[in-house]
């Protein structure tokens, strides 16, 4: 019946004068391999992606290290900050002393990240480092509260901790709220008659991803796993550079005991004054060890990015200004950091940095293969500052040192922040001269750009480095700035060109990945969430569909012997095809960006005989519609089937592709 409906629709379209587009797929000759790393994910701590997001810690400013030491905390009674605590790089702690007013208790109340989302019946692990300075005993009372309730009792649940001795020790308790609440607070009450010191106050759900104590929020990590990422780029883009060198991302600060990982500012807390979050910092609870663990969990190749000694060039355009960029002659510590990172990931457990990894619970190497040097860096020509090769001169020093000691590591350079223009044109040939293995392209562009760049990679130099499309998304005009259906559809169209050119494009990652609905600075994003719920944008599903149907080899697909890339006469169609040796399937992806349904005839050269094919379709009428927390599955891919007909020379599919739709055909050969 479905097949009959398809024929009738096709006939109706043809009778109305619509041209049938013939897509020729050559299944007899395999093209370039599709790299396992082709479709991946890129994590940057923007939009509260780490603290308040993927990292499951519920307490904000748990070690009192924010510049405002009580940021995130409400205080009552006699509470002061001291700076001689047990952790060298996080020395501050809170002293909770008697108030001098009878039984009145000193109290700390943490508001979390836009509140604390807690679920009824689930256990939460409270922990604190504490001591009684005079060596006696004291009790801490721990409450999870709804402090806005009109009910008789604010407490959702409570527990107690007995503290004893003048030495710092870790104490734990389990809290189990009876009801679910999105905006809970954590209260810590001190003994009214004894001084108690507290440090690193923490609250985690016990049900984290893989059950790890310093773990990830389970639903968000699961969403990443479900994307089937072949590569995982981390820890970010601009945060790698830092506003200045002091605030750059330093991986060594993110490993070892979590209590001793020093706080760093997050450059995204002040970048946009219209979305200003002054209490947005990086606790580094989610550090390089945890990133490598996630790569292992997901089956992804790790792609860490390190500072090249240039802070953000947007904010510091003059490279001669003292203190914002490292002089070439002073690069050695930065290069050593890169070498040490490779040892941390791959070195034996008895090496200096391999030992750190082993002590964290992973004596086996992580088998790192890729390393990015720099983010959106660039050189200058005479017409644009005249400062010369400030990036590539530094990149060469990194490359020489890394190639000498670790020749098997694949190095990734960059062509700067733009997908075309003087800086891109300057850097692209220099990446070839430096013989980097891949270079990282970034493009956040509008609808017109995505519609007109379907052939972007067809003319790229095949003799140079491979391409990593490391950050991209369609940023629609006006209200399309959100994750609307139409912009996601254009991303799907663009990705046919990425796939068709798998011989030159080896990696591609959409960006950004995460956004908290109350704490975002940048949109669109792949995954949105609040403290309890999450939803996957349409862009997420586009990425997932490509990753789950990437195949193993490109198959040539043409219309009138031309690539199907929205060219003149193709009526807004984009298409690509791959062979999947694992499943024995020919996979054809077709995107119709046009306003009308398009009848298509897909000729499957090399396949004979009728059969039924599986389809997956992403189609929606409202171009401005999107998924939301309240309607998380408003727009999702739909499975189906279609009939493959037995032609005289080749099997074929007749279909009427709906307007503004993306359809995948999976044909057993």
Locations of the language-model features?
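Extracellular and organelle-lumenal recognition/adhesion modules and their flexible linkers in secreted
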Residues: 19-283, 301-303, 318-324, 328-329, ...
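Active-site cleft segment of glycoside hydrolase catalytic domains centered on the general acid/base Glu
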Residues: 156-160, 170-172, 205-207, 213-215, ...
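Catalytic-core region of carbohydrate-active enzymes that cleave or remodel glycosidic bonds
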Residues: 397-401, 407-410, 429-433, 437-549, ...
């Amino acid at each position: 019946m479905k097949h009959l409906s398809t024929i009738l629709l096709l006939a109706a379209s043809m009778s109305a004068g619509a041209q049938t587009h013939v897509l020729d797929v050559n299944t007899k000759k395999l093209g370039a391999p599709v790299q396992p790393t082709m479709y991946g994910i890129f994590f940057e701590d923007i939009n509260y992606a780490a603290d308040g997001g993927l990292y499951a810690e519920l307490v904000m400013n748990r070690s009192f290290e924010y510049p405002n030491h009580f940021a995130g905390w409400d205080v009552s009674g006699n509470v002061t900050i001291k700076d001689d605590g047990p952790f060298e790089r996080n020395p501050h702690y809170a002293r909770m002393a008697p108030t001098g007013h009878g039984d009145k208790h000193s109290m700390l109340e943490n508001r979390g990240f836009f509140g604390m989302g807690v679920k009824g019946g689930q256990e939460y692990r409270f922990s604190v480092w504490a001591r009684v300075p005079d060596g006696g005993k004291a009790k801490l009372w721990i409450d999870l509260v709804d402090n806005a309730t009109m009910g008789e009792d604010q407490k959702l649940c409570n527990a107690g901790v007995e503290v004893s001795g003048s030495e710092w020790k870790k104490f734990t308790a389990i809290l189990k709220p009876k009801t679910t609440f999105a905006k809970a607070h954590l209260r810590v009450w001190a003994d009214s008659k004894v001084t108690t010191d507290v440090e690193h106050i923490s609250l985690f759900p016990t049900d984290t991803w893989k059950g790890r104590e310093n773990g990830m929020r389970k639903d968000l990590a699961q969403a990443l796993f479900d994307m089937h990422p072949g590569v995982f780029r981390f820890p970010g883009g601009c945060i790698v550079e830092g506003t200045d060198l002091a605030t750059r991302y330093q991986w060594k600060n993110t490993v070892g005991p979590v209590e001793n990982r020093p706080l760093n500012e997050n450059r995204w807390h002040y970048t946009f004054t219209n979305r200003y979050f002054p209490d947005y910092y990086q606790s580094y609870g989610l550090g390089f060890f945890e990133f490598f663990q996630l790569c292992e969990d997901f089956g992804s190749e790790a792609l860490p990015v390190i500072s090249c000694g240039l802070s953000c060039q947007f904010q510091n355009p003059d490279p001669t200004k003292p203190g914002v960029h490292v002089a070439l002659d002073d690069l050695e510590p930065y290069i050593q950091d890169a070498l040490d990172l490779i040892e941390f990931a791959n070195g034996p457990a008895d090496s200096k940095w391999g030992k750190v990894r082993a002590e964290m619970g992973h004596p086996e190497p992580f088998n790192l293969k890729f390393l990015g040097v720099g983010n959106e860096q660039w050189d200058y020509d005479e017409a644009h500052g005249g400062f010369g090769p400030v990036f590539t001169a530094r990149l060469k020093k990194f490359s020489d040192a890394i190639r000498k000691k670790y020749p098997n590591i694949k190095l990734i350079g960059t062509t700067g922040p733009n997908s075309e223009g003087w800086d891109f044109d300057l850097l692209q040939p220099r990446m070839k001269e430096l013989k980097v293995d891949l270079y990282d392209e970034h493009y956040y562009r509008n609808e017109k750009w995505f519609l007109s760049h379907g052939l972007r990679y067809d003319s790229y130099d095949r003799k140079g480095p491979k391409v990593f499309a490391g950050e991209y998304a369609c940023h629609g005009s006006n209200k399309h700035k959100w994750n609307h259906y139409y912009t996601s559809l254009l991303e799907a169209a663009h990705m046919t060109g990425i796939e068709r050119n798998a011989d030159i494009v080896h990696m591609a990652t959409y960006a950004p990945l995460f956004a908290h609905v109350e704490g975002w600075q940048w949109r669109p994003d792949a995954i949105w969430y609040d403290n309890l719920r999450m939803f996957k944008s349409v862009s997420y599903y586009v990425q997932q569909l490509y990753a789950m149907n990437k195949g193993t080899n490109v198959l040539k697909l043409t219309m009138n012997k031309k690539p199907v890339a929205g060219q003149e006469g193709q009526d807004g169609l984009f298409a690509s095809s791959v062979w999947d040796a694992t499943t024995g399937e020919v996979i054809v992806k077709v995107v119709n960006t046009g306003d009308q349904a398009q009848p298509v005839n897909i000729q499957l050269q090399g396949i004979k005989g009728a059969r039924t094919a599986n389809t997956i379709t992403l189609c929606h009428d409202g171009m401005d519609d999107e998924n939301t927390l309240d309607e998380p599955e408003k727009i999702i891919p739909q499975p189906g089937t279609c009939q493959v007909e037995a032609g005289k020379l080749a099997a074929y599919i007749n279909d009427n592709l709906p307007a503004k739709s993306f359809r995948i055909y999976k044909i057993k050969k």
